Every structure is written in C-alpha cells, then in structure tokens.
Amino acid sequence: MSQDMLSRAEKNASKASITNVKFVLSPITKIPLESESADCIISNCVINLLGQDEKPVCFKEVHRLLKPGGRLAVSDILAKKEFTEELKRDMGLYVGCISGASLVGEYENWLKGAGFEGL
C-alpha cells in the first residue's frame, strides 16, 4: 500500500461514515498494532507478491494481530506445481499476481505453522 492508497482509503471511509476501521502504512511483516487487536484482516492479491521467506513471517504477524476467534480472509493465486525460473521472473505475470504464487501445500503449512486452524 502506498501513501496515496492510504489517503484514498481514509477518504472513502470518511465519506461512508465508517469509524470502526484503522488504516496503517507499514511493512506487512511487522505491523505496529497491538497483539489481538483485529477482528478481521483482509488481503487481496498481496501476500503472493512477498518473497517466499517473507510469507510465513507475514502469516505469523497476521495471527498475532487477530483477536481470539478473529478471521483472516485471503484472496491469492496458488499453484499446484512449481513455476519455472523464467515464469517466476516474468514481470507481466508478477503484476498479474501469478508469478509469486505459492504451492497449495506450502500455503497451508505456513498458515498452520502460524497457528491458524480450520482451513
């Protein structure tokens, strides 16, 4: 998220009189919010843009932020088999949220490793 996107989100929330939301500009792997402070965290085509080593860190951070019984809603593209190095480096596929796709099993392991249940 950029500062411009953050400003737009705040403006839209204000226009809609939404007051129970907080927008924070920070690295996704180290969010400056208190533990167990979020009821729901939504990610749309973001986590797959992280490097492979950052993805499990991201899920641990999200789990830390969620209140007991909180929900994580993720929309990401997952792969059934490993992409070739050429496909991983393809900028068009990266921008289209494809080249950063993780394997289904990896994703499930990262979520479980972070403490998520009921996948």
Where are these regions (language model features)?
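Class I S-adenosylmethionine-dependent transferase superfamily signal
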Residues: 45, 61-62, 111
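A short SAM/SAH-binding and catalytic strip from SAM-dependent methyltransferases
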Residues: 39-54
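A short acidic, Gly/Pro-enriched loop at the edge of an enzyme's catalytic core
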Residues: 29-41
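Acidic carboxylate diad motif detector
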Residues: 74-76
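A short glycine-rich, Lys/Arg-flanked "PGG" loop and its adjoining helix->strand segment in the class I
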Residues: 56-71
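Short alpha-helix
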Residues: 99-115, 119
